[in-house]
Amino acid sequence: MSRTAWLWAVVILTTIALAATFLVTPRFPVPVPESGPPVTPFGWTSQLSLVAGDGVRGVQDGPGAQARFDDPWGIVVMENGTRYVADAGDSNRIRRVARDGVVSTLAGGREGFADGTGAAAAFHTPSALARDIQGNLYVADTGNHAIRKVTPEGVVTTVAGTGQAGFRDGPALQAQFNGPIGVAVDGRGRIYVADTYNDRIRLIDRDGQVTTLAGGDAPGFFDGSGSEARFGTPTGIAVDATGVVWVADLRNDAIRRIGPQGVVVTLPMRPDLPTQAGPRRPLSLALTHDGNLYVGELFTGRVMQVMRDGRWHALAGHLPGQRLSRAAGLAVDAAGHVHFTDAGSHRVHRISALAVGTAPVAATVGPSKDDPLPVTAGRWPLQPQDGWHEVVGTLGEVRGDYQGESRHHLHGGLDIRGDVGATVLAIADGKVSSPSAAWNFDGLSEGLSVGPLDYIHMRVGRTPRGDLLDPARFQLLHDLSGDPSRIRVRRGTRFAAGDALGTINRMAHGHLSIGPSGYARNAI
């Protein structure tokens, strides 16, 4: 064979081999490696389905479609498919959701701080859940500033914390936390805690000693080692097989990584589509078997896939008509399905993978239209609460924005005229669910969320002079220069109708809205 013919033969055979490789390589599912389960593909097509909850706030055991949750938050999935959910609000229970969707109660049932079995135990706003290899559950008991343990038989004990807010390392039952929302357990049985309102990550070792892994004396946004690092209201936490701790750093809109030596770095995020808005208030985390992440958002309700290199893709909650409210808890089962709680819609969902080219079908999402409104008894948010007040804005009006666009959005609530400095009062009893319930400090749209009600255009928790209305419920944070920067109200804080929430700012009216974004209703 001539040299030219031989070269052409090599070229042709190489081309055929490359073409064959391209044609037979599937995009999804990924082939199973010989050493274990398949690698988690990026950007898989998702199908959302309802597991349990009828979308009405309440407490009701029974078949999934008729069961009711109040404020479903943390979730774990066992090998047999059973799910456990931490249900806060007025429920304060740990619920069991069987494979067939039937819901029952494992432990709790009243707001308090008591160890015991089943209904004898008491929780105060249970948030995240984690599990150990023996099948025990660990609860971030936010309102009790404690970490609790629940056995498969429903026996509840306190692992760490005194029941009082504070910050102290040391023996577990003498250590103090401040509203912990996140909890995770590694393969050695060590417990990691997102100590939310201390802005720290804590570690409960197997010898019962509590130490601080990372974070300092004040909130902030700095990478570094140990106490040099700063967090801003960390809520979600997970630990992978290599000992790396992942943190949903809520107020910093960031995912943070803590290495085995305690060095904190921020994961650089980049979307698969340049038009997608970046993560907004990451709330919850779950890890895949190969160390990638799923992240739930507080404000948009989206569930996102986040790879270790920072690439991310919206899986659920981003499509028209399929909007979610608050992806508060996430868990991944052995088959790779993602289970999550939608706290604002009082439901539990599952996300499954579809083959490439298969379109997802619409699922039941959002709160039910039958979800009852808060009991306001006709109260107004200003004095006199049973008197006459002028309504200056109603639900559904066409409104402009601050940049001059006259038809920017539909008004999402009710506006009541009030004098600048007038005290804003709660119109119903309520309990704070959001870990970041106050927003836009000193801005025109400053507001506070109490249960399903939002109170806007006020100085949250402050008089016109800036003094706190109630230091036990409102905490004033300062920036590095010592200037006031934010009001913090813990998840689990209660307000009664008539309690002072703030004072009207220079907008000269109070705004009331009810319901998660996309599901607004008339607040009066």
Predicted region positions:
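Gly/Pro-rich loop segments of beta-rich domains
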Residues: G36-W73, V102-S127, V155-G179, Q209-T233, ...
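Residue-level detector of Asp-centered blade-edge/turn motifs that repeat once per structural unit
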Residues: V77-N80, R131-Q134, V185-R188, V239-T242, ...
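Conserved beta-propeller blade signature
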Residues: T82-V85, N136-Y138, R190-Y192, V244-W246, ...
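Short loop/turn segments immediately following the C-termini of beta-strands
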Residues: A88-G89, T142-G143, T196-Y197, L250, ...
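A short loop-to-beta-strand structural motif that recurs across blades of beta-propeller domains
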Residues: N92-R96, V102, H145-K149, V155, ...
